[in-house]
Swiss-Prot record:
Belongs to the malate synthase family. GlcB subfamily. The active site is at residues 339, 630. This is Malate synthase G. Its cofactor is Mg(2+). Keywords: Cytoplasm, Glyoxylate bypass, Magnesium, Metal-binding, Oxidation, Transferase, Tricarboxylic acid cycle. The modification Cysteine sulfenic acid (-SOH) is found at residue 616. Its EC number is 2.3.3.9.
Length: 727
C-alpha cells in the first residue's frame, strides 16, 4: 500500500491526489477543497445503493440455482418464465417511448462507420486508434490477406509491383461502385480536375465525364486544374483520392493517383475496462493520464521501428476547398468515447468508511468526466465533441435498476463538475442477460442521455452460461454462435433500439471481429452486421477499420434501419432458450478438444495479464491463429469449463493435466518475448498458472462468472512478488 492523503471522509492515494490536483483541477473552474469534499459526499451517498445492487445480483443467482436444481429433468418453459417474472428477473415493460437525447455529434447520430476499442494503458495504440479516423486503403489492401498472394502477388520484404497493380485495380473497382462516373470507369481516368465547381475526369481517349451523382464531390486540395486531393462523399463517409505523379505509386498510375484514403473509425472507445489491467492507484493514474493527454491533444508515444526512432502524436484536422470556393474542415481524429468500469469492482486508489476501497465505477465517472470537461471549456488543442457532450460507455449492467443507478451517478457528477444536465451521454453495453431481456426498460432509464447500445457476444455468452449454471451442461463454445438465444439477442437489440427512436440519433453497435490477421474473411463476413441494422461495429485495428469502412459504402445503413423499423417482434421467449445439452453425446476426443482450446486460450491471455499487466493482446490459439483476447473472451472460456466440471463432463484431474500441457504450448508461443516468464515446469510457483486454475476451478462461485476479482487479486500478488525479487 502506498501513501495516502486524508481529505474529509476519504483517503486518497497520493499518486492520484497529486495527479488530480496538479494536472486535472487547474483551469477546470473547480475549487480544489470543494472538489474533494463533493467527491467524498458522492462516495458516501452512492456506495450503499451500489452495494444493494450487487447483493441483488447474488440473491437472484441463488434463486436461479435453486430453481434449476429443483426442476432438473422436468423443465417447463412456462413455469420458468413465470418464476423469472416472480423474482423480478423479467420486468413489466414500460409503455412505448422515444429517446430525447440532444447535442449528439454527427459521428454518432448521422454517420455510420467502424468503431475501434483500444486500451488506455498503451499510449501508442490509443494514438493510432484516435488517428484511425482516416486510413490508407492501399496500405490496408497491400499489407493484409485482403489481396491474395496468388499469381506472383506475394507481399515480400520489398515493394512488389504485381501486388501493387492488384491493389490499384481493387481501388478503382471500389470507386466505380461507391462514386461511379456518369460515363466510363475510374480505371479509364488519366486526370482529375475541378472545372466550374464540378469534378471533371479525363479518360485515356481524351473524353471527359463527371460523377454520376455530382453532389458526391465535396472538396479538393491544391490547384483546381491539378488537385493533390479530391474529396468525395458516399453514404455519409468521405473518400479522398490523393494525386502525386512524383510519388513511387503515383508514377505508376496513369492518373497519378498515389492512394485512396478512407474515412474509417469515426468513433473510438478509449477503454479503461475489459482491455486494460488496472488493479491499483498507479495503474489507474496511467489510464487517466493517457486519457487526459488524448483530450488535451499533447499525448505522444516514442518507439523504435525498423531501427528508427518514431514519435506518434495526434493528427490535425483536414482542410479542403469546397466546390463553391469556401473552406471545409473535417476532423483528423476519431470522436472519442471513454469506457468506465461497471458496478462490481473496487480499487484502493481511494478509501472511505472503515478503510473500504471505493467502487471503481464511481471513481471512473468523476475523474474521466473531469478530464473530458477540459475539452468543453477550451483547454485543449482539439475539440473532441463539437456539440459539447461527454461520451461514457457503461458496461456490465444487469437490468434497469442498475442503469437507473448509472443515470443517478451521472446526474451527481454533472452537478459536482458544474456541467449542464445530460452533458454526460451514456453508451449502454447490452452484454448481460437481465439487460437483454429488459432492454426497453434499461433504455427508458437513460432516455435523455443514451447515445449507444451494443451487443457483445462473448460477455453475453459468459453471463448466459453462469446464469443457468445449474440447468445442465452447455453447448461447446463455437456452437453458441448458432444457438437460438444468440440469434434472438442480436435481432432484439436492433429492434428495441429502432423502436426507441435510435435511427438518426444514436448508435446501434455490433461486436468485434477478433481475428486481425484474417482480413479477407472479415471483408466477406462483417458486412452482414450492417444488413442486420447496425450503424457501427467493432474492429481490432486501424487497418481493419479502413477495410471495414468499405462495407458502409456497400450498404446504406439508414435505408436498412428504415426497413427494419417495422420489426415489432418480441424476441424474449427465444432469448430465454437455455443453450443446455440434455443428453450430451460428445466423444472423449471432442471433450478433450474443447478442454485443449479453452485451456490454451485462458493461459495465453492470463499469463500476459498477470505477469506483464497486458489487458488486451493478440493471443495465438491452438492452431496459431492470432485472436484478439480481452476479459470477455476469458469469461466465456473459463465459464464453459466451470460448467462442464460442475456437470461431470470432465474431471478436475483432466482439466489440470490439460492446463499443464497447454502451459508448455503457450510458453513455446511466447519464446520470443524477452519479458515472458514461463509457467512450466514450476506450475505452483507461477502466479499466472494459479490464476488460470482459479478461474476454472472457482468459476462456479465467481459473481456472475466475472473474471476481475481473481485477476485483480493475482495481479496484485504478482506485482508484489516481482517487486520483492528486484529488491
Amino acid at each position: 500500500m502506498g501513501e495516502y492523503v486524508q481529505k474529509g471522509n476519504i483517503q486518497v492515494a497520493k499518486v492520484l491526489y497529486d495527479f488530480v490536483n496538479e494536472e486535472l483541477l487547474p483551469n477546470s473552474g473547480l475549487d480544489q477543497d470543494k472538489f474533494w469534499s463533493d467527491f467524498g459526499a458522492l462516495i458516501s451517498d452512492l456506495t450503499p445503493r451500489n452495494k444493494e445492487l450487487l447483493a441483488r445480483r447474488d440473491e437472484i443467482q441463488e434463486k436461479l440455482n435453486e430453481w434449476h436444481k429443483a426442476h432438473r429433468g422436468r423443465f417447463d418453459f412456462n413455469e420458468y418464465k413465470a418464476f423469472l417474472t416472480d423474482i423480478g428477473y423479467l420486468e413489466p415493460e414500460v409503455e412505448d417511448f422515444e429517446i430525447t437525447t440532444d447535442n449528439v455529434d454527427d459521428e454518432i447520430a448521422v454517420q455510420a462507420g467502424p468503431q475501434l476499442v483500444v486500451p488506455l494503458t498503451n499510449a501508442r495504440y490509443a494514438l493510432n486508434a484516435a488517428n484511425a479516423r482516416w486510413g490508407s486503403l492501399y496500405d490496408a489492401l497491400y499489407g493484409t490477406d485482403a489481396i491474395s498472394e496468388e499469381d506472383g502477388a506475394e507481399r515480400g520484404s520489398s515493394y512488389n509491383p504485381v501486388r501493387g497493380a492488384k491493389v490499384i485495380a481493387y481501388g478503382r473497382q471500389f470507386l466505380d461502385e461507391a462514386v461511379p462516373l456518369a460515363q466510363y470507369s475510374h480505371k479509364d481516368a488519366v486526370q482529375y480536375a475541378i472545372v466550374d465547381g464540378q469534378l471533371v475526369v479525363t479518360t485515356e481517349g481524351g473524353a471527359t465525364t463527371g460523377l454520376k451523382e455530382p453532389e458526391k464531390f465535396v472538396g479538393f486540395q491544391g490547384d483546381p486544374q491539378h488537385p493533390t486531393a479530391v474529396l468525395l462523399k458516399n453514404n455519409g463517409l468521405h473518400i479522398e483520392i490523393q494525386i502525386d505523379r512524383e510519388h513511387a505509386v503515383g508514377k505508376t498510375d496513369q492518373a497519378g493517383v498515389k492512394d485512396i484514403v478512407l474515412e474509417a473509425a469515426v468513433t473510438t472507445i478509449m477503454d479503461g475496462e475489459d482491455s486494460v489491467a488496472a488493479v491499483d492507484a498507479e495503474d489507474k493514474v496511467l489510464v487517466y493520464r493517457n486519457l487526459f493527454g488524448l483530450v488535451k491533444g499533447d499525448l505522444t508515444a516514442t518507439f523504435e521501428k525498423n531501427g528508427k526512432i518514431m514519435t506518434r502524436s495526434l493528427n490535425p484536422d483536414r482542410v479542403y476547398k469546397t466546390p463553391d470556393g469556401g473552406e471545409l474542415v473535417l476532423p483528423g481524429r476519431s470522436l472519442m468515447f471513454v469506457r468506465n468500469v461497471g458496478h462490481l469492482m473496487t480499487n484502493n486508489a481511494i478509501l472511505h468508511a472503515n478503510g473500504e476501497e471505493v467502487h471503481e465505477g464511481i471513481m471512473d465517472a468523476v475523474i474521466t468526466s473531469l478530464i473530458m470537461k477540459h475539452s468543453l471549456i477550451g483547454n485543449t488543442r482539439y475539440l473532441n465533441s463539437r456539440k459539447g457532450s461527454i461520451y461514457i460507455v457503461k458496461p456490465k449492467m444487469h437490468g434497469s435498476a442498475e442503469v437507473a443507478f448509472a443515470n443517478e451517478l451521472f446526474d451527481r457528477v454533472e452537478d459536482m463538475l458544474g456541467l449542464e444536465r445530460n452533458t454526460i451521454k451514456i453508451g449502454v453495453m447490452d452484454e448481460e442477460r437481465r439487460t437483454s431481456l429488459n432492454l426497453k426498460n434499461c433504455i427508458y432509464q437513460v432516455r435523455d442521455r443514451i447515445i449507444f447500445i451494443n451487443t457483445g457476444f462473448l460477455d453475453r455468452t459468459g453471463d448466459e452460461i453462469h446464469t443457468s449454471m445449474e440447468a445442465g451442461p452447455m453447448l461447446r463454445k463455437n456452437e453458441m454462435k448458432s444457438s437460438t438465444w444468440l440469434q434472438a439477442y442480436e435481432k432484439s437489440n436492433v429492434a428495441v433500439g429502432l423502436a426507441a427512436g435510435f435511427r438518426g440519433r444514436a448508435q446501434i453497435g455490433k461486436g468485434m471481429w477478433a481475428m486481425p490477421d484474417l482480413m479477407a474473411e472479415m471483408l466477406k463476413q462483417k458486412g452482414a452486421q450492417l444488413k442486420a441494422g447496425a450503424n457501427t461495429a467493432w474492429v481490432p485495428s486501424p487497418t481493419a477499420a479502413t477495410l471495414h469502412a468499405l462495407h458502409y459504402h456497400q450498404v446504406n445503413v439508414s435505408a436498412v434501419q428504415s426497413e427494419l423499423a417495422n420489426d415489432r417482434n418480441d424476441y424474449r421467449d427465444d432469448m430465454l432458450q437455455i443453450p443446455v445439452v440434455d443428453h450430451p453425446q460428445w466423444t472423449a476426443e471432442e471433450i478433450q478438444e474443447e478442454l485443449d482450446n479453452n485451456c490454451q486460450s485462458i493461459l495465453g491471455y492470463v499469463v500476459r495479464w498477470i505477469d506483464q499487466g497486458i489487458g488486451c493482446s493478440k493471443v495465438p490459439d491452438i492452431h496459431n491463429v492470432g485472436l484478439m483476447e480481452d476479459r470477455a473472451t476469458l469469461r466465456i472460456s473459463s465459464q464453459i469449463l466451470a460448467n462442464w466440471l460442475h456437470h461431470g463432463i470432465c474431471t478436475k484431474e483432466q482439466v489440470l493435466e490439460t492446463l499443464k500441457r497447454m502451459a508448455k504450448v503457450v510458453d513455446e508461443q511466447n519464446a520470443g518475448d524477452p519479458n515472458y516468464r514461463p509457467m512450466a515446469p514450476n506450475y505452483d510457483d507461477s502466479v499466472a498458472f494459479q490464476a488460470a486454475c482459479d478461474l476454472i476451478f472457482r468459476g462456479y462461485e465467481q459473481p456472475n462468472g466475472y473474471t476481475e476479482p481473481i485477476l485483480h487479486r493475482r495481479r496484485q500478488e504478482a506485482k508484489a512478488k516481482f517487486a520483492a525479487i528486484q529488491q
